[in-house]
């Protein structure tokens, strides 16, 4: 999330968009750089489904109707769980898009050949005589 200009609410950036920096979110994997950051929507869905089923229906998190609910109202927690489920779906689809883009770039050219050509050209440099 990044702070908006002029005190506006923070905005989220999708890690799958090329012109934006990936979201920096503190996660357990921050402590272990080798840990997977893959997000599974299905795992989140299975975890929150009982809460959502028990609540029946709920307003969208953050809306005026949601803000008016008492903090002890199970529909308020259900709305937060539903928002978490939507967030997990968004992150999972962005991760899939990034992985596909990586595969597309990898297949787009003969990258080892391009690297060899760059190295070969560096050895052909001819220094120019200085102008007196």
From Swiss-Prot:
Looking up InterPro entries in the UniProt record yields: DUF2742
Question: Which Pfam families does this chain map to?
Answer: DUF2742
Stretches the record annotates as Disordered: 1-34
Query: Family per UniProt?
Result: To M.tuberculosis Rv2656c.
Stated name of the protein: Uncharacterized protein MT3573.2
Organism per entry = Mycobacterium tuberculosis (strain CDC 1551 / Oshkosh)
